[in-house]
Amino acid sequence: GAGVTGIVMSQDCVDMYNPKVVRSTMGAAYRVPFCYVDDLAEEVKQMKEAGICTYAAHLEGKNSYDEEDYRKASAFLIGNEGNGLRDEVADQAQVYIRIPMKGQVESLNGAVATAILTFEAARQRR
């Protein structure tokens, strides 16, 4: 994998024990710690206070994801493809980043965006 140490999700995210999720993750859902929180914006605030740099994958990101340094403790904030991140969560991010697109594509689904960002972080940490 990409070396992810944990996943924090809002209560309205997918059920990680859903059989389709377990199948699509090939069991990784059981190997990476995860939790659901009631107030994701507050969790992001606590991450920042703990020295974790928070990056929002956002259409308004000025820097491309591959221009940032992820060698330090990092958290990626990923929204769903229909609505993106909720404003109150995105507002807590320290840095807005974008994944450049070609052609008519406006956004990627959350799994694809997460894979791109986490594997870039893993590449930098080698």
Regions found by a protein language model. Give the residues of each.
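Short flexible/disordered coil segments
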Residues: E49-G51, Y70-I78, I116-R126
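RNA substrate-binding interface of SAM-dependent RNA methyltransferases
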Residues: G1-G61
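Active-site/ligand-binding-proximal alpha/beta "capping" segment
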Residues: Y55-V105, N109
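Short secondary-structure transition/capping segments
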Residues: P19-V21, Q46, D66-D69, G110
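Structured adenosyl-cofactor binding patch, chiefly the S-adenosyl-L-methionine
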Residues: G1, M16-A29, D87-R126
